[in-house]
Design a protein with these regions (language model features):
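Active-site recognition of the HExxH zinc-binding catalytic motif
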Residues: 53, 69-77, 81-82, 142
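Catalytic zinc-binding patch centered on the HExxH motif and its immediate surroundings
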Residues: 35-49
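Extracytoplasmic and endomembrane cell-envelope/extracellular-matrix remodeling and assembly machinery
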Residues: 1-7, 11, 33, 128-130, ...
Length: 345
């Protein structure tokens, strides 16, 4: 897995998550998000309170509430204690599997290879079916809980449905009925049916928050620019909006066209002088050009604009400072790197 770090991505995700945590037993600080550089639509929870999100989930969404709906679903697994229940169920199922597997081994030594292999396969299938049923119940429960989380916090939960429809189009031609049967998730059509029924019984048609949608659009363009080819990016982002300019500034930077990238970013900063992420990227490009002083100035401005401690930003400015020749700057750089480690050991 290629785990990526990005302040804009992390902060926006936490902002969406925080909206969902009212009247739950979870605190935002307890949840760890990890972002995987992968174009597939996916997110999952592992032991504890760790949520993994593929970048493809964000780049293929059209509305921030689709992303928020998936977060709500994963939070519901945590709130429901599904990860711990799953561990116990796996242990229980492994105990059931042992005698069936031994029956297969005995058959081999008795000279009945076909019978033995059939027994092993039957044993594996029966155990898998037991876990499949168990997991599908958890997924259905998480869908229902996600709807409740969204509606109770005045977020339109129909976007869980629109996300599933998007996922359905992606998987329709690639997943067989047999794979659906073995899948730990219920078939998407079944999930959509349950969600539709739930939504009919709730008043959940809330308007979107325009500021969040604008933030999402910028973040999406950034991720697409960093994870797709130049041809793909320029085909998608051909206009003069902030979203278009952001993507083109990044793809120009990645292509080595630093002067073009700097010109575009300065236009963006004139339009949105309080956006810290434009300043962050500007500093990164100056650093790549070898203009360390300008890199430090812009990263310092970015840190002032986010107005909260960031381990990632402390690490970045610390790295910039230690490249300077004077000892005072190097010492300041080390201090910032220590702050980064203190926040995120």
């Amino acid at each position: 897995l290629e785990i990526i770090r990005d302040e804009e991505l992390e902060k926006f995700t936490k902002e969406l998550t925080n909206e969902l945590l009212t009247d739950t037993n979870l605190n935002l600080e307890d949840i760890n998000f990890y972002f995987i550089n992968n174009k597939e639509i996916n997110a999952f929870v592992t032991g504890g309170k760790n949520i993994f999100v593929n970048t493809g989930l964000i780049t293929q969404a059209d509305d921030y509430r689709e992303y928020q709906a998936v977060i709500a679903h994963e939070l519901s697994h945590i709130i429901g204690g599904h990860i711990f229940n799953t561990s116990a169920e796996l242990k229980n199922l492994s105990n059931k599997a042992l005698p069936v597997y031994l029956l297969g081994i005995i058959g081999i030594f008795a000279g009945s290879a076909d019978t033995a292999i059939s027994s092993i396969m039957l044993g594996q299938a029966s155990v898998q079916d037991g876990f499949t049923y168990y997991s599908r119940n958890q997924e259905a429960s998480a869908d229902q809980a996600a709807i409740n989380l969204m509606c109770s916090n005045k977020i339109n939960a129909s976007y869980l449905l629109s996300f599933l429809e998007k996922l359905d189009r992606k998987t329709l031609d690639s997943v067989s009925n047999e794979n659906y049967y073995r899948s730990t998730h219920p078939p998407i059509d079944s999930r959509k049916e349950w969600i539709n029924i739930s939504l009919k019984n709730k008043e959940c048609e809330f308007e979107n928050t325009q500021i969040l949608q604008e933030k999402f659009n910028l973040l999406k363009s950034k991720l697409i620019a960093f994870t797709h080819s130049k041809q793909e990016v320029t085909a998608i982002y051909r206009g003069d909006s902030n979203v278009d300019l952001y993507a083109n500034a990044i793809i120009s930077y990645l292509s080595g066209d630093h002067s073009v990238s700097l010109e575009i970013l300065n236009r963006l900063i004139n339009r949105e002088p309080n956006n810290p992420y434009f300043r962050e990227l500007l500093g990164e490009i100056y650093f790549a050009k070898g203009d360390f002083d300008s890199a430090i100035i812009n990263q310092s401005i970015a840190m002032e604009l986010i107005n909260e401690p960031s381990d990632l930003y402390f690490m970045m400015i610390g790295s910039y400072l230690i490249t300077l020749e004077d000892q005072i700057s190097k010492n300041d750089g080390i201090k910032n790197l220590k702050k980064s480690i203190f926040i995120n050991p």
